[in-house]
């Protein structure tokens, strides 16, 4: 990825508004090997359900924490997004969207316990995803005049909307599904399902965004975007609506002007409805969730960002009808968790040294087909 001169100024901005990473990270591991969080997205009382992760990857429910807002309700995948529930880079904060009340909630993370510390309007309708980089937080509002809105994050984990930070997407009701910062914080990418566009915004030194650079995805069905640590942008694509097992994943490099250059275009996932992806913290693998097939596929990430299928590509199989939505990986890159809306479980898979998956069980503490969206883990 080419570099631009604003990088150093952006780092200075992030440092000036950044919350205390070290002090909060110290309390983020007060119990268990880690934690997993899911969001019920209830239209009456949006809540986060937390689980303590043990060393063998199994989960024990730890608590329920109200966001102070309302979700959208629904049945299966009502938010149609990746990133409705997002951990900060150091796992000390958890951000949750309240799609029904148009707000974002911020929690301090103490192991598997949460403390609500802030809640702010998102500056738009139906927020469905959030991304964080240092002291910057951007929220995706999918309803009406679809937009992204920026906030600064101070030492007390309080949000403040950045003046003139609203950027509208290329169409109203864009069905935008995800947003992600590049690893160096220079770019924010947003996927639009209605147009099959990937919008790129350069992040300015004051935290606002530059003009929209519109990129057409090389494959149909652009849904979720995530970045590998080496800077490659990884896009999950559902594929043609009428095709069977036609979902794909593509990787791109982001050039200095915001245009995307394909690296691996349309690598088959051998499943249906690949809408979500997750990159392991060690940067070696990316996994995708084929919701309509109830399967997980995996790919190794090369030094150039090229994608290579791991083994037979389909590595994890949930029970038929699971409708696995969002997926998350533990901080040690040893376990993958899938939010299975169809049967009301969290699927648990062990990640082997070669990237293959082993099914090690499931947790049963969520309600089937009740509108759950969003999962995060460390």
Tell where the protein language model's regions lie, with residue ranges.
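Short loop/turn segments immediately following beta-strands, especially the blade-tip
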Residues: 51-58, 107-113, 152-159, 201-208, ...
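Structural motif
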Residues: 45-49, 103, 147-149, 197-200, ...
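Residue position within the beta-strands of beta-propeller blades
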Residues: 38, 96, 139, 190, ...
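Blade-level signature of beta-propeller repeat domains, shared across WD40, Kelch, NHL, RCC1
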Residues: 341-378
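Short loop/turn segments immediately following the C-termini of beta-strands
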Residues: 41-43, 53, 99, 142-144, ...
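Beta-rich, blade/repeat-based domains predominating
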Residues: 27-31, 68-90, 122-136, 167-187, ...
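Aromatic- and glycine-enriched pocket-lining scaffold segments that form the walls
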Residues: 138-206, 210-224
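A short beta-strand motif characteristic of beta-propeller blades
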Residues: 62-76, 115-121, 162-169, 210-216, ...
